Swiss-Prot record:
Pfam families tied to this protein: HS1_rep, SH3_9
Biased composition range(s): Acidic residues: 17-28
Entry comment on modification after translation: Acetylated.
Physiological role: Contributes to the organization of the actin cytoskeleton and cell shape. Plays a role in the formation of lamellipodia and in cell migration. Plays a role in the regulation of neuron morphology, axon growth and formation of neuronal growth cones. Through its interaction with CTTNBP2, involved in the regulation of neuronal spine density. Plays a role in focal adhesion assembly and turnover. In complex with ABL1 and MYLK regulates cortical actin-based cytoskeletal rearrangement critical to sphingosine 1-phosphate (S1P)-mediated endothelial cell (EC) barrier enhancement.
Residue numbers bearing the Phosphotyrosine modification: 421, 442, 466, 482, 485
Chain residue ranges for the region called Disordered: 1-28, 355-424
Modified residue annotations for N6-acetyllysine: 87, 107, 124, 144, 152, 161, 171, 181, 193, 198, 235, 272, 295, 304, 309, 314, 346
Main location: cytoplasm
Family annotation (SMART domains): SH3 (SM00326)
Positions of crosslink type Glycyl lysine isopeptide (Lys-Gly) (interchain with G-Cter in SUMO2): 144, 181, 295
Modified residues (Omega-N-methylarginine): 119
Protein name: Src substrate cortactin
Species this protein is from: Mus musculus
Keyword Glycoprotein annotated: no
């Protein structure tokens, strides 16, 4: 145990024989006041009544500490005057590039509900391939996940397996035989190279931009020391080879441009007195020029260019213009267009059937009338030939037994067949307005043709025998008979187009229908008879029959 207590100062307390600890010193003075006696002794630390905290002093201390802390932060922290344009914002070289001023207006992006998200992803329905986002992939895209590091074959790219595939060696990879050369330290480098070599005697290695100690830089003269007489003709202006081309001397006299009132404007307009024709301005006109004003629309003669006046100047005829006599004839195979709905409906079929029946009846009536007319003409022609033959026989009989009267005038001997061909002369195409003239009335007796009912027992005189030249009048009467038949129908016309009556006083007709008894009451509207009805119809829908 003595080893444990070695090196320590051991103090042993002595027993005082049981002295009383409460015994006071003989010189003790009780200097405790009444207040200290009541609130505790000052000799005992922490005893007694503690005083309350002074709030005003505490607030003042906190304010002083806060002020000191703020001043310290302003001194050590970043200053707001730097980087934002300097003090007062006028130092542009210190302006922060990423800072914007109060005039900056930021453009807010649209809300998701306002953005048209169909753009840029193939357009609407994804079919606009030209608007497909290049970085967007569709649902058919299959991303290939990269292999884990444990799955990769690192033997490739480093010389292949076992390092013998030299064509696969990585260019940036070095092998174990590579020996890297460490760069020398700054203290080991020889800086004598490049500045003239060692000792500055290798002139071929001298740095071009380096100068030696013998170099003496010439300071540029001040503006007040420069001689500006060079370059403007040299000193005293006598060195003309050094004269500035753009500089003018004191002997230069600038010629001012003449005022508008002083210029001679007679040049370029024919010269002086207007006789220099080669100098005359081509676009200038003289005082003898008379401007001809264009005529008003009401004064222009629009007869030019459409065949000239009265349409007789063929060389001025407009190639694209057509005359009034060029009427496009509608082909006879015209068929009235029927809508598809009308073809399928039964009512329209019935109506079409009735219309077809009516057309067929009209065509049959027309054919019957033409056949009856042809038969009547053939019958009348046969009767005329018989009457002519009888007259010729009577003439021959009279010629064989002439009477005792004075000798008659000689009768021209005509071949018997000549009267037959003579009847072709009166049959000529007559104009359509023939029916409007009064019909000449020819009696059958005057023509020398007896009636069919009174041929028997009728004695013929010799007067028609010697006046056989009046026989053509009979055929003229025949034509007049047919003209009278046509004149009963009045002016006729044939329909070019179909027309449906729009009112009760109008008539309807189809193409190729014949309108008779036409009355031209107006230029655009006529009145006539067609299909048993009498009324108005447009004149440009029909064509008059010749």
């Amino acid at each position: 145990m003595w080893k444990a207590s070695a090196g320590h100062a051991v103090s042993i307390t002595q027993d005082d024989g049981g002295a009383d600890d409460w015994e006071t010193d003989p010189d003790f003075v009780n200097d405790v006041s009444e207040k200290e006696q009541r609130w505790g002794a000052k000799t005992v630390q922490g005893s007694g009544h503690q005083e309350h905290i002074n709030i005003h002093k505490l607030r003042e201390n906190v304010f002083q500490e806060h002020q000191t802390l703020k001043e310290k932060e302003l001194e050590t922290g970043p200053k707001a005057s730097h980087g934002y344009g300097g003090k007062f914002g006028v130092e542009q070289d210190r302006m922060d590039r990423s800072a914007v001023g109060h005039e900056y207006q930021s453009k807010l992006s649209k809300h998701c509900s306002q953005v048209d998200s169909v753009r840029g992803f193939g357009g609407k329905f994804g079919v606009q391939m030209d608007r497909v986002d290049q970085s967007a992939v569709g649902f058919e895209y299959q991303g290939k996940t990269e292999k884990h590091a444990s799955q990769k074959d690192y033997s490739s790219g480093f010389g292949g397996k076992y390092g013998v595939q030299a064509d696969r060696v990585d260019k940036s990879a070095v092998g174990f035989d590579y020996q890297g050369k460490t760069e020398k330290h700054e203290s080991q480098k020889d800086y004598s190279k490049g500045f003239g070599g060692k000792y500055g005697i290798d002139k071929d290695k001298v740095d071009k931009s380096a100068v030696g100690f013998e170099y003496q830089g010439k300071t540029e003269k001040h503006e007040s020391q420069k001689d500006y007489v060079k370059g403007f003709g040299g000193k005293f202006g006598v060195q003309t080879d050094r004269q500035d081309k753009c500089a003018l001397g004191w002997d230069h006299q600038e010629k001012l441009q003449l005022h508008e009132s002083q210029k001679d404007y007679k040049t370029g307009f024919g010269g002086k007195f207007g006789v220099q024709s080669e100098r005359q301005d081509s676009s200038a006109v003289g005082f003898d020029y008379k401007e001809r004003l264009a005529k008003h629309e009401s004064q222009q003669d629009y007869a030019k260019g459409f065949g000239g006046k009265y349409g007789v100047q063929k060389d001025r005829m407009d190639k694209n213009a057509s005359t009034f006599e060029e009427v496009v004839q509608v082909p006879s195979a015209y068929q009235k267009t029927v809508p598809i709905e009308a073809v399928t409906s039964k009512t329209s079929n019935i109506r079409a059937n009735f219309e077809n029946l009516a057309k067929e009846r009209e065509q049959e009536d027309r054919r019957k009338a033409e056949a009856e007319r042809a038969q009547r003409m053939a019958k009348e022609r046969q009767e005329q030939e018989e009457a002519r033959r009888k007259l010729e026989e009577q003439a021959r009989a009279k010629k064989q037994t002439p009477p005792a009267s004075p000798s008659p005038q000689p009768i021209e001997d005509r071949p018997p067949s000549s009267p037959i061909y003579e009847d072709a002369a009166p049959f000529k195409a007559e104009p359509s307005y023939r029916g409007s003239e009064p019909e000449p009335e020819y009696s059958i007796e005057a023509a020398g043709i007896p009636e069919a009912g009174s041929q028997q027992g009728l004695t013929y005189t010799s007067e028609p025998v010697y006046e056989t030249t009046e026989a053509p009048g009979h055929y003229q009467a025949e034509d007049d008979t047919y003209d009278g038949y046509e004149s009963d129908l009045g002016i006729t016309a044939i329909a070019l187009y179909d027309y449906q009556a729009a009112g009760d006083d109008e008539i309807s007709f189809d193409p190729d229908d014949i309108i008779t008894n036409i009355e031209m009451i107006d230029d655009g509207w006529w009145r006539g008879v067609c299909k048993g009805r009498y009324g108005l119809f447009p004149a440009n829908y029909v064509e008059l029959r010749q």
